[in-house]
A protein has these predicted regions:
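Structural motif
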Residues: 33, 118-119, 145-146
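Cys/His-rich short segments
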Residues: 4-60
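Acidic, Ser/Thr- and proline-rich intrinsically disordered linker/docking segments
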Residues: 132, 136-194
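Anionic N-terminal interaction surfaces
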Residues: 54-115
Length: 194
């Protein structure tokens, strides 16, 4: 909603922390710079305006405001059978992996690890000698902390994944909870995590 003026030279900066579904391509990644962001698949570029409206460069962006786009993204995920995405990863990121020691500290386990998100698991350094496969069926919860940290609750342990300033932890949470809804027979469940 255009309820004021957003004055900044970086209005679109880090939009990729929350956006991962392109209205034209489906699951995708975005890259932002200043007031603009682009889909890495189709290359369409849009501008985030001072009035908080999104405008396509040379095309009509289907959503006027980010909230509408976010609702579309949630509907897209809820309409997707993520259990069909087990052969190729939906997303590949780079992250540092830490073990969270409750009421104490964090212990770094891996730096600059490749993180792959499938429709039923997270893989860390897949295909390498130290590969770690984390089946969704063995997780009790997945959550976003701060701007871009992902916590997974794996048995009695908690692990944290942190990437660059542009890392999107939200997609991991949403895909996990979509998988969980399907596995629990709640195919129309709307909850995609917090």
């Amino acid at each position: 909603k255009a309820d004021g003026v957003f004055e900044s030279d970086f209005k679109a900066e880090y939009i990729e922390r929350a956006a991962y579904v392109c209205p034209f391509c489906g699951f995708s990644e975005f890259e932002s710079h200043g007031n603009e962001f682009s889909c890495k698949i189709c290359g369409k570029t849009a501008v985030y305006g001072e009035d908080k409206r999104i405008t396509g460069k040379g095309f009509k962006f289907p959503f006027e405001f980010f909230g509408e786009w976010y609702d579309f993204q949630m509907d897209f995920v809820n309409g997707t059978d993520v259990t069909e995405y087990t052969e190729r990863p939906l997303f590949i990121d780079e992250a540092t992996v830490k073990e969270v020691i409750i009421r104490k500290n964090k212990k770094t386990l891996r730096k600059n690890s490749e993180l792959l998100l499938y429709g039923d698991r997270i893989a860390v350094d897949e295909g390498k000698e130290n590969e770690w496969i984390i089946p969704f069926s063995e997780l009790s919860a997945v959550s976003v902390l701060g701007k871009n940290k992902l916590n997974i609750y794996y048995g009695t342990e908690v692990f944290q994944f942190s990437g660059s300033k542009r890392f999107n932890a939200l997609k991991y949470v949403n895909i996990y909870y979509r998988w969980k809804n399907i596995k629990e027979g709640n195919i129309n469940g709307k909850f995609l995590g917090l």
